[in-house]
Amino acid sequence: MNKDDLDLDLEIIDESPSSEGEEERKERLFNESLKIIKSAMENVIQEIVIKLEDGSTHIVYVTKLDWVDGKVVMDFAVLDQERKAELAPHVEKCITMQLQDAFNKRSKKKFKFF
């Protein structure tokens, strides 16, 4: 997902009075915005917030996730494409830790008899 994937028909707000009331206009704009967001997020499996050593914070959108031969295979999108390569090992580590934790919890449950 990147900014070029979205079709943004943004309304130019006119200062002149409209036939629709303020509340109706707000509701319509909210619904249009919600539709755009849902469309952009329909392929997102998980959102992760990562804070790098330099203090910068990045929202990562995981769009593909597989476990092949003991390794995580994934794809993700970020708003700052210039830092995607820098974020990749952090995203992979985060996903791997989550999967390992889930496998460990599942394995522990198999050995409980009550």
Curated annotation (Swiss-Prot):
What segments bear the compositional bias annotation Acidic residues?
1-14
What range does the record give for the signal peptide?
none
Give the organism, scientific name.
Enterobacteria phage T4 (Bacteriophage T4)
Q: Which residues form a coiled coil?
A: none
- Pfam families assigned to the protein according to its UniProt record, in alphabetical order: Phage_head_chap (PF11113)
Q: Can you say what this protein is called?
A: Head formation protein
**Gene name in the database record:** 40
Query: Which InterPro entries does the UniProt entry name for this protein?
Result: Phage_T4_Gp40 (IPR021049)
Q: Residues annotated as region Disordered?
A: 1-26
Lineage runs: Viruses, Duplodnaviria, Heunggongvirae, Uroviricota, Caudoviricetes
In UniProt terms, what function does this protein have? Answer: Helps head vertex assembly.
